[in-house]
Amino acid sequence: MILFLLYATTTVFLVAGIIYFASKRPGYSHVKQTISELGEDNAPDSRIVNMGLFLPVGLILILIGLLSRNDNIVSGLAICLGVGYFISALFPCDAGSPLFGSGKQTIHNIGGFIEYGGGIYFLHKGSHL
């Protein structure tokens, strides 16, 4: 129950943070842009988005994954999501989050692959139980 509450609180914190920082960014579109762009290089609030939103969310999700050892699906999903947020916080994307860019963008994209690829894998694996 405690892990569920921690996960739910983290989800609310993340969603509220995304909505808040997007509202402070004129022209930002939740449909046309990635959330990584809220913390991209030279974005107005990039430091707080990366260190105050993405980093704590990533660390908490990794913690949830480590504490969920008895459930491989939840554990794997939480760790993959957490690693993605953790990497994105430490390696913010280039402006516009291009597919190809600087070395930092490449590391950022690898974090995204772990997050989305791992997320899809564990959700698919969980759907077959």
Residue ranges and their predicted role:
Residues M1-Y28, N42-L129:
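Hydrophobic, aromatic-enriched alpha-helical segments typical of multi-pass transmembrane helices
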Residues V31-K32:
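A detector of repeated loop/turn-to-beta-strand junctions in beta-rich toroidal repeat architectures
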